[in-house]
Amino acid sequence: MSQIVDIKAREVLDSRGNPTVEADVILADGSVGSACAPSGASTGSREALELRDGDKSRYLGKGVLKAVAAVNGPIRDALIGKDALAQAEIDHIMIDLDGTENKSTFGANAILAVSLAVAKAAAISKKVPLYAHIADINGTPGVYSMPVPMMNIINGGEHADNNVDIQEFMIQPVGAPNFREALRYGAEIFHALKKVLSDRGLSTAVGDEGGFAPDLSSNAEALAVIKEAVAAAGYELGKDITLAMDCAASEFYDKEANIYDLKGEGKKFTSEEFNFFLQDLTKQYPIVSIEDGLDESDWDGFAHQTKLMGDKIQLVGDDLFVTNTKILQRGIDNGIANSILIKFNQIGSLTETLAAIKMAKDAGFTAVISHRSGETEDATIADLAVGTAAGQIKTGSLCRSDRVAKYNQLLRIEEQLGGKAPYKGRSEIKGQA
């Protein structure tokens, strides 16, 4: 009864008002799974291709009718009659039919929407929650944990129209006893930060991921105002709350000059100098995780960064690894970073995403489940984080319903699972156990 009898796709809007693909997968027993593909702003050059129409007369060229047509045509034809419980088989049928390394025939946005909708339909057919079905197909049935959130409360870089070069300044409520309380810690600090910024006469407008996006004198000032907000909310920095950053350094790397150019504060660095700049920040503040601290192609620089800080803090590869097992394996073999950011649409299917998480864990890396800056109300990443016991999730700030949808789903899951999904706090972060 879990055979696929129909697949439908449509163009819907993401949180930036750009089109994306939503797919419905209908099974013989009447189960229907629906899923939307997210979209990134600061993207790695090796990511799977997000297929856009390029027709400037519609949505400024960002329409996805070609990807929708791929779902409603060849993908649907290939999957009718297949068993939705056979996730890997279905994903590989789509990958093989596409026939390209980067999914450029159908688009990763088309393949991913169907892949996730299949998983949702299968879970409904089995009458189990999505996180339980994900754990089953991951080969880890019944093994769950609640993730420590990385809450992006100050936005810069490609996620905001301000002068802050580093893209994300995040808090992690590592001292909370459970996820529900972690969310409360974060929300209270978010509101305290709004008052701190307002009292300084700074903007409290928010960026793509719901964090505040003020103009600041330096990137370090972002950490200073967060420190003030943590104290104002009644929490202890370094004990209750730790800090994390996503530099998205590829966005301010000058490839021709081989320089990291922090235009917002008028500073330029070589690769090694920028590593020491970051290390200095970790000595001033309890920063326990740095993501994409260098350009995605600066592997020598990443080797230096890992030697410099990799035994003390979590060094996360996002643009560096793009959820791709081939690239991740190279990083593992060469001692590059110690953690991977996991984004469904960088690789384009649930099966390949699970493979990347497994490879990371087997190598002693951590895996941080992540949203994209262009999101929808789809909360699948919440179930992915719990169902793979990944331990950490990055899904934005404490406002914008496209972000809060994931937090609310995690609240529901924690309530359902009770003590079966522990919240382990600091020990989930590489170098902090």
From Swiss-Prot:
Names of required cofactors: Mg(2+)
Record keywords: Cytoplasm, Glycolysis, Lyase, Magnesium, Metal-binding, Secreted
Subcellular location: Cytoplasm; Secreted; Cell surface
Transcription regulation found in the keyword field: no
Binding site residues for Mg(2+): D246, E291, D318
Cofactor comment: Binds a second Mg(2+) ion via substrate during catalysis.
EC numbers for this chain: 4.2.1.11
Principal location listed in the UniProt entry: cytoplasm
Reaction equation(s) it catalyzes: (2R)-2-phosphoglycerate = phosphoenolpyruvate + H2O
Pathway: Carbohydrate degradation; glycolysis; pyruvate from D-glyceraldehyde 3-phosphate: step 4/5
Active-site residues per Swiss-Prot or TrEMBL entry: E209, K343
Single annotated GO MF: phosphopyruvate hydratase activity
UniProt keyword Transmembrane helix present: no
SMART domains per record: Enolase_C, Enolase_N
Gene Ontology cellular-component terms listed: cell surface; extracellular region; phosphopyruvate hydratase complex
Positions with a binding annotation for (2R)-2-phosphoglycerate: Q167, K343, R372, S373, K394
Biological processes per GO annotation: glycolytic process
Summary of the function given for this chain in its UniProt record: Catalyzes the reversible conversion of 2-phosphoglycerate (2-PG) into phosphoenolpyruvate (PEP). It is essential for the degradation of carbohydrates via glycolysis.
Subunit annotation: Component of the RNA degradosome, a multiprotein complex involved in RNA processing and mRNA degradation.
Record family assignment: Belongs to the enolase family.
Protein name: Enolase
